[in-house]
UniProtKB/Swiss-Prot annotation:
One of its GO terms (cellular component) is cytosol. This is SsrA-binding protein. It comes from Rickettsia typhi (strain ATCC VR-144 / Wilmington). The keyword Manganese does not apply. Its main location: cytoplasm.
Length: 152
């Protein structure tokens, strides 16, 4: 049985710029106006990343547009947002992030079947320029293959 996900935002650059080694799911602490803005699909996680702050993990650089009808109770668009994880998961993440070259990148943000906002995080290692070129070559080759198959 497939799990229901209503995707709000995706980070397609992360898959191109990083080797994703492990994928995790985390809840996120939001204000009411942020949830309303997310329901309208007004969010961007293109340059967002997560980092530890002591014994907690926060999501940085996640842009959630201000909700128009919230007036003075509105939120800051790029404020750090706390991620909800189990203690074991936090320790595991912090251990892997502290290794040189690894980072925690937001891959997607979505509503699950209970209408809770979840963030899909990836423990990632940065790609070098030649790795990116190899990825582009693979994509081009797959496109050429599909064209050749369609022509026959």
């Amino acid at each position: 049985m497939t799990e229901y996900k209503k995707v709000i935002a995706q980070n397609k650059k992360a898959i191109f710029n990083y080797f994703i080694e492990e994928i995790l799911e985390a809840g996120i602490v939001l204000k009411g106006s942020e949830v309303q803005s997310l329901r309208q699909g007004k969010a961007s996680i293109d340059e967002s990343y997560a980092s530890d702050n002591g014994h907690e993990v926060f999501l940085y650089n996640c842009h959630i547009t201000e909700y128009e009808k919230a007036n003075r109770f509105n939120h800051s668009t790029r404020r750090p947002r706390k991620l909800l994880l189990h203690t074991k998961e936090i320790k595991k993440i912090i251990g892997k992030i502290r290794i040189k070259g690894y980072t925690l990148v937001a891959l997607s943000m979505y509503f699950n079947k209970n209408n809770k906002v979840k963030v899909e995080l990836g423990i990632a290692k940065g790609k070098k320029l030649y790795d990116k070129r190899a990825t582009i070559k693979e994509k081009d080759w797959k496109k050429d293959q599909s064209r050749l198959i369609r022509q026959k």
